[in-house]
């Protein structure tokens, strides 16, 4: 008989203002741990319910928005356009219902467990198929667990989505430290390497002795770290974003080195795109001064939304079309976009999430000076056409010598799992198929 205790956990919405009353069901999970398991390693069921006062405060802030003048150009060269933001805020204030997001989350098996002194929130959906392959998927910024929700059923229940029963996965989706309902680090050091070790501990704690991992954006950095650490049980990884580069490319893009000789036209284009991407304003500011940008993002929901939208050109165009023209890209709908922004707002996680870039910038500087440990485990990679930069196969092969799968998809962008969940799931099935049954 599993012992249960229900209590209310307060997540601060705004410092000194309104607290979110998140109803959390705490219990020792009989599936993974016995009733006598210490609380430090216990897996506690979790559900969320935001206080009405927090939602009222959000609506009040939206209504009190002080708008800037319209941009002076007809494109997005000056940043997020006023028409896009006004359409988003109009929807957010008058049509959007956070309770629908809560219901969607609470319909899934959610849990919290303490790893390395920090509470880690995660979704864990087990397939009905007996030989399902366990997989841990890591989101990025400005995403969250919201960007991965639509791929859960195609992965866990492939036969309902045109797949085969033998392609099923047990799905584990944690919230990164400092994001969403996970705890916020109180000391420096929660870089991708540390998160990678925590993720392996999570999979072991769930009883998995053999599993795979997937990541894009910040999640790619974590998954890359897992691949380099190569813990016992991790048999392969998949990326949809190249986070590490051949040494000569790394030196040219980040260390001021010369452009490597002999690059193909595609590689030259990729190098230019990589160099430009890592000089974008959000990445530089969050990498250097996350605390500074945290003040306006914590005080203004509209400021937070604009900052999150100004991520990459392809995603911005799709989001703008969703609000201005009513033409969403796949599951990247108005509701899902605002679900994601509202999750950041209600959990007051803009600053703590941005600190991951501060941590990663130091790791990247180390990589320029000292090449990281090579990856020997099997690696799969999918390139999506709307991604910030197109990873050349030659680079992926140099960084990951044991590349077992490389495919260029015909649609999808930086948030590929969000935009094209069925396609993304089919890529993961194909990528990991060679590893099923291999002991």
Which residue stretches match the model-derived regions?
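Non-catalytic accessory segments flanking enzyme active sites
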Residues: 55-126, 131, 336, 345-348, ...
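Conserved acidic catalytic loop of the alpha/beta-hydrolase fold
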Residues: 193-211
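Conserved alpha/beta-hydrolase
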Residues: 155-181
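Conserved hydrolase catalytic core segment
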Residues: 154, 158-160, 209-259
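Bacterial N-terminal signal peptides
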Residues: 16-28
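Glycine-rich "HGGG/HGxG" loop immediately N-terminal to the catalytic nucleophile
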Residues: 98-100, 146, 163, 176-190, ...
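Short beta-strand element of the alpha/beta-hydrolase
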Residues: 132-140
